[in-house]
Amino acid sequence: MAPDLAMKPKGCWRPSLAKGTIKKKIFLGEKMTEYKNIIVTGGAGFIGSNFVHYVYNNHPDVHVTVLDKLTYAGNRANIEEILGDRVELVVGDIADAELVDKLAAKADAIVHYAAESHNDNSLNDPSPFIHTNFIGTYTLLEAARKYDIRFHHVSTDEVYGDLPLREDLPGHGEGPGEKFTAETKYNPSSPYSSTKAASDLIVKAWVRSFGVKATISNCSNNYGPYQHIEKFIPRQITNILSGIKPKLYGEGKNVRDWIHTNDHSTGVWAILTKGRIGETYLIGADGEKNNKEVLELILEKMGQPKDAYDRVTDRAGHDLRYAIDSTKLREELGWEPQFTNFESGLEETIKWYTDHQDWWKAEKEAVEANYAKTQEVLK
């Protein structure tokens, strides 16, 4: 029987159980560590709020404290309907040592999602990325160290840089070194990815130097409900819904390894409860697609011509290809992705943004105006 991954009844997405979309419930093995009081940083953002909903729906004995600064990418509405006895929201900065100390004293685990994550924003102003991604992570680690509590750090595959396209590789993307693994050397290429790499490294150092009970996960590109409309998939969907032509960087050959955010949630839970301290696990669902392919699929699903988009100037230092090898997570912890049909997941995501225009419409004009400062339509 498939697990109940339902979100809130209004303003939330209930994933389809259509054939080929969701597999059977994942097996996490026999020995799991139970946590009763967890802090989820960034739990009002896209990936973090989906994790909070996952815990709320699947682990009724767990109390969640969401610590979120509620910047433009955090939204109280993402968790509004589950706030109560089991989920509380604390509005604050993860770099506020006094606040973090107060919360950590009552917790037995921290799941650290909070991050500044938009590459374009990091190129315009790197300072918030240093503050949140590095100083914030340090502050949380010190609290975990003080109270000897479990710490899981949620990171990105972008810390590894990028890979050549499959057609340019001897193993066509499946050979040794042709996907990211936990052994891949760090090679970040943007202010965003460099601050995430730095935060990964201090987690590793705090494990080795101070015995902090920490793990790290590096995940590929997420999609699903609650993603801010500055991001690639929701931006294209909301452009079409707003009568604006979608925008494609350059030739659109850049490849991303897509994973549904609910699969990310189950992966993080598996690592939190069963992962080996000090280990890094990569979370991916074998979802490699180039940006042009994804955009054309969105256009097709929304009844538009496949060429009804504008090409714009490419992002500086735009990484070419990401690809995750999640063998370690699958074999060691028994995790498997449930959303294996990208088209079905994309259809559900399109439906969510179509049905919840009140969630994103107020921000649409400002988001496009911000992009217009740096993007020029190519002829």
Where do the language-model regions lie?
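C-terminal substrate-binding subdomain of Rossmann-fold SDR/epimerase-dehydratase oxidoreductases
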Residues: 15, 28, 39, 51, ...
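Residue-level signature of the cytosolic catalytic core of signaling kinases
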Residues: 75, 83, 225-229, 287, ...
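NAD(P)-dependent short-chain dehydrogenase/reductase
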Residues: 78, 163-179, 191, 201-273, ...
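N-terminal Rossmann-like NAD(P)+-binding domain of SDR-like oxidoreductases, especially those catalyzing
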Residues: 25-222, 352-356, 362, 366-379
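Generic recognition of short, well-ordered alpha-helical segments
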Residues: 50, 77, 102, 121-124, ...
